[in-house]
Amino acid sequence: MALRKRRSVPDASDNPKHVPARASLPAPRPSGSTKFMTRVVMSFAMIGGFVAILYGGHMYAWGLVVVLQTLLFRELVNVRYRAAAEKNIPWFRSVQWMWFVVALFYNYGDSFGAFIESSKIRFVPPAIVHYLRYHTWVSFTMYALLFVMSVLSLKKGYYKYQMGQYTWTIVTLGLIVFQMKYVLTNIFNGLFWFLFPVSVVICNDCFAFFCGKLFGRKFIKTPFLRLSPNKTWEGFIGALLCTIVYAFFFSAFISRFSWLTCPVESFEFKLIPDPLTCTPHDVFLPHSYDVPVFIARVINRSQIQLLPIQLHSFWFAIFASIISPFGGFYASAIKRTYHLKDFDSVIPGHGGVMDRMDCQLITNCFTTVYFNTFIRSRIPSVATILNLVVKLTLEEKQDVLQAIQEMLQS
């Protein structure tokens, strides 16, 4: 009796050792100094491009974030990509990208609506009002259709592989889409709330490198983290102290520029937008603070004048120094699991976009929570109330007007 022939393509395994490496020709390794110079040059190029985009305005900054999220999704999905299997699964990659598009559509529409409700924008274009009115329904319809399509795309012999890929897709969307749900709100509240947290994380990363190189394992021999053996306690502590100092002074410096501190007040897109002007938020105005007695004796002053944002900057520095690095450690765990040196080579000297953004994702989430809890006013603005009144019928508007008149008379 002939033995039954097994299928030619076995059910895929999740063992990372079975993930085939991409074939590439051996190339000569660049020297350490060449790699360092490439890294430095690209760092300054990225900083210059970032500042130029910020100067272009809020919409350009939002566009940058969407591009980065797209590149991040591509890199993370490619971590588990297996060309041999997916050649036999038509439309599978397309379905993954559809999930990404639907997630972006829902997230940005939801955060866009939340921003309008709490902003000072007095006029919202009818097209945007119509979009927000049906946004949730359209998002759910897209989700339902895509859910059905995903189930129909499952192919016998590849169930385990496909389910693993879908699970990884959901994790990826959680990292780069839902964790950054309110990045649009941060940008529209003022580019300060986008630039400052990003710069604090970059500062901490740089100082951790230099402090680790200068003082690493000279005072504390205990390994910092087995997941990242090159990290040292000296680098971690030194970066914390340096980041606190940096955040204190840099927050005061960029508070001078109204185009960074002013929120969006209209949705008119211009290729070259006009400079923003506004009444500064209270956190960007100087206040007098009493100095503790033991410090007052040293500086011979009982009060000092600071910007409230300089005091808030302390918590941004603490978070960027203690919590944000774990985003990098998590990314390192992914690379170790799948035997990768970098997520990609799109940025010479730096690797992939994820290699540079791993610590930024959770910091953006922190910025949103911190701003809404400690910075944003809980008193509704006039613009917020007017946006609600516009939605009322004529009779309801007359009732509101009469109620306001009675309040003023009393």
Protein language model features and the residues they cover:
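Functional transmembrane or membrane-interface alpha-helices that line membrane-embedded catalytic
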Residues: 217-238, 340-351, 369-370, 377-378
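C-terminal membrane module of polytopic membrane proteins
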Residues: 336-344, 353-410
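Feature representing long, continuous alpha-helical segments
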Residues: 239, 312, 316, 324, ...
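Membrane-embedded alpha-helical bundles of polytopic integral membrane proteins
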Residues: 2-323, 404-410
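Transmembrane-helix exit/juxtamembrane "anchor" motif
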Residues: 60-62, 77, 333, 374-380
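Short, membrane-exposed interhelical loops at transmembrane-helix boundaries
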Residues: 295-305, 342-353
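Transmembrane alpha-helix interface/packing and boundary motifs in multi-pass membrane proteins
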Residues: 319-323, 344-348, 359
